[in-house]
């Protein structure tokens, strides 16, 4: 038996043990959090991933670690370069012993939002209730570790399982990592042009913090920037200038309410599945001093779409701004551009939930799901699932429990099993 299988079996023995089997063979004083983490190959992998800073744009170190780990566990690894300010790459891996090309893809992201927060553990009398903290422990290195372990356990039980792993960069910023993978005809081939490595994916399992629920879909997104040009003057003589701030405020007031206004009255659409479209004015900047009439004003806005397309939402926003400002030519709305030109963003994403045994939910946050091109001819199933809560992701109190991590391995294996049943 080779070392990779032994390692996989070690992971199996930990993560599939019942609560009773893991019960206190040691007293509270005998079991420190460090010893508990050190004793588990799975929790140690999660610790090592979280301990490596990987804020978007600086993912190379964690990518190298993950690539080395997978190679040591009998995976062939491809480091796919991703354009950017620094040299960074996606990690694509498939088992070297698999007799067939991969058709089941497990994927998550290895970048995090800033700032880096060191790994730490809070002890609990029940080992499964131990709380792990640190940047990325929840979003999304919990999913990364659980997907790796689920794949290892599956391969230990079924060495011919046609699995592949993909861990991308830049998900938290613009999705450049997933788009680079999506456009790669060797790693993500079309049905008309199969590659020597991959025939085509039948199932794609995305990892994000979903509280262990299977997600039936998430809202779409549209981002834009509002810029207003005015004319500066002394604040004692404001009529000599033109306040850009006074011009932008009515526009922002209308934009802020678009999700609450019915479509027939010029608002953004809602849906039964996703509720209402929400608008967030995330940044406003104007002027240089309190005693100067501001010559410029800017705002950044993000819209979470409950229905419709980005193009339709763009038209609604432009009409609302024109109406609020009297079609002022000094007011410019610039929308984020898509990778192939045109307006960026995406419509709501509907996902599959046909595997029994999961709670079903929808989420409001965005993912890499729309950045990965799938081919209808392949009859692709797309699942979104993972440990941890989005409510603590990105915050200074980001955390996850051992129980959630362990349950996620079982959940990913259940999804893999369903995917295998579709193939065989």
Swiss-Prot record:
- What cofactor requirement does the entry state? Zn(2+)
Check the UniProt entry and state the signal peptide residues, or none. 1-17
Q: How is the cofactor bound?
A: Binds 2 Zn(2+) ions per subunit.
Record bears the keyword Secreted? yes
Q: Name one GO cellular component term.
A: extracellular region
Alphabetical UniProt keywords: Glycoprotein, Hydrolase, Metal-binding, Protease, Secreted, Signal, Zinc
- Single GO term (MF): metal ion binding
Its localization reads:
Secreted
Reported EC number(s) for this entry are: 3.4.17.-
Which positions are annotated as binding Zn(2+) 1?
139, 172
Transmembrane spans: none
Where do the annotations place Zn(2+) 2 binding?
A: 139
Gene Ontology BP, a term: proteolysis
Q: Where is the active site?
A: 171
Which residues are reported to be glycosylated? 58, 184, 323
Entry similarity comment = Belongs to the peptidase M20A family.
| Name by which UniProt lists this protein | Probable carboxypeptidase AN5749
Species of origin reads Emericella nidulans (strain FGSC A4 / ATCC 38163 / CBS 112.46 / NRRL 194 / M139) (Aspergillus nidulans)
